[in-house]
Amino acid sequence: AGSKSRSRSRSRSRSKSPAKSASPKSAASPRASR
């Protein structure tokens, strides 16, 4: 569970960045995109 919690925290921080769209991880994660 700790690993998932960190992943969400990173996703949020990247979501604010405009590079999130260029990130392949964001596209693979539909939850982070939303």
Swiss-Prot record:
Please name the GO terms that the record assigns under molecular function: DNA binding
Q: Where are the sequence repeats?
A: 3-4, 5-6, 7-8, 9-10, 11-12, 13-14, 15-16
Q: Where is the composition biased (Basic residues)?
A: 1-17
Kindly list the places in or outside the cell where this protein is found, as annotated in its UniProt entry: Nucleus
| Presence of keyword DNA-binding | yes
**What are the alphabetically sorted keywords of the record?**
DNA-binding, Nucleus, Repeat
* Tissues where the protein occurs: Sperm.
Bias kind Low complexity: ranges: 18-34
Q: Which GO terms describe its cellular component?
A: nucleus
Q: Which domain of life is it from?
A: Eukaryota
Does this UniProt record's set of keywords contain Nucleus? yes
Name of this protein: Sperm protein EM1
Q: Where is this region: 7 X 2 AA tandem repeats of S-[KR]?
A: 3-16
Region annotation (Disordered) maps to 1-34
